[in-house]
Structure formats: structure tokens, C-alpha cells
Amino acid sequence: MKNVTDSFLSLGHWSSAGSFGLNTDILATNLINLSVVLGVLIFFGKGVLSDLLDNRKRRILKTIQNSEELGVGAVEKLEKARARLRKVKTEAEQFLVNGYFDIEQEKLNLIKSTYNTLEQLENDKNENLRFEQQRVIYQVRQRFFQKALQRAIGTLNGCLNNELHLRTISANIGMLGTIKEITD
């Protein structure tokens, strides 16, 4: 490694007349060398730098265009969402109004149904009362006729002889059969 370093140092000490060498003294370099280096950099670097700047410009413009498209799309989506929100609000209000109407309608139907049920129960009660009254009247009549018949038989038994007694019993049995047929 030391040989390589020595060879570079020896190049710096060569005389400038008739030979080519590197001048390691930065302050001693002349304006021409700097101009040549800058010219080479500008000539070869100009295309690369121009391409880099053009690519960067295209990317920036494309990003701006994409951002604008996304912004327009976002505005459209926002408008659609607002329209959907208005529609949902309208439907909700309609459901609310319909809900109140349905509740009132159900309430009226329930009241009407309850009234009809109570009326039917009242009719059934009255019919049952009439039936029970008829049954009680029938039973009272039956008992009355039985008592009257027993009294009549008792009176007849005390007053009549056997032959008259048998004829009376036969007649009463016939009357009872007729009464039974009428009531059935």
C-alpha cells in the first residue's frame, strides 16, 4: 500500500515542462482547468439533469391531476351520500308518520274489537239469562202441576170410590201425556 501512495506523491513532484502530471495544489489550479471540468459536467450532465427534471415535472403534474380527479370523485361521492342521507331522512320521517298512523289505526281497531267482544258477551249473558229464566219457569210449572195433581189425587182419593177412582186416574194420566207432548 505504501508503494501506491509513493507513486501518487512522485507524480505531484514531476516538473511541468514536457510532461503530464497532476497538480495536487488546489490553489495553484488555473481557471482553464475549472472551465473544462464545468463544461464537461454541463455538457454531459445537462441531458441527465433535464431528464430528471422532466420526469419530476411529469410526476408532479400526474400527482396533481390524480389529486384533482380524486377530489372530483370525492365531491361526487359526497353529493351522492348527501342525497342518500336526504332520502333516508325522508323515508325515516315517512316511517315515523306511518308508524303513528298505524299505531292510531291499531288502537282504534283494538277499541272496536273490545267493544264488539263486550257487546257479544252482553248478548251471550242476556241469552243465558233468558234460557235460565225459561228453564226455571218450566221447572216451576212442572212442580206446580205436580203439586196440583197430587192435591187433586188426594182429594179424589178421599171422595171417590174405586171405580170412579180408576177412571179419574186414567183421565189424569192421559192429560199428563198431553201436557208432556206440548212442552216437548
From Swiss-Prot:
Annotated compartments: Plastid membrane
Keyword presence, Nucleotide-binding: yes
Membrane topology category: Single-pass membrane protein
Keyword tags: ATP synthesis, ATP-binding, CF(0), Hydrogen ion transport, Ion transport, Membrane, Nucleotide-binding, Plastid, Transmembrane, Transmembrane helix, Transport
UniProt xrefs under Pfam families: ATP-synt_B
Gene Ontology MF terms: ATP binding; proton transmembrane transporter activity
The keyword Ion transport appears for this protein: yes
Top-level taxonomic group: Eukaryota
One example of a Gene Ontology biological process annotation: proton motive force-driven ATP synthesis
Main location: plastid
InterPro entries given in the database record: ATP_synth_b/b'su_bac/chlpt (IPR002146)
UniProt GO cellular component terms: plastid membrane; proton-transporting ATP synthase complex
Cited function: F(1)F(0) ATP synthase produces ATP from ADP in the presence of a proton or sodium gradient. F-type ATPases consist of two structural domains, F(1) containing the extramembraneous catalytic core and F(0) containing the membrane proton channel, linked together by a central stalk and a peripheral stalk. During catalysis, ATP synthesis in the catalytic domain of F(1) is coupled via a rotary mechanism of the central stalk subunits to proton translocation. Component of the F(0) channel, it forms part of the peripheral stalk, linking F(1) to F(0).
Family: Belongs to the ATPase B chain family.
Name this polypeptide is given: ATP synthase subunit b, plastid
Underlying gene: atpF
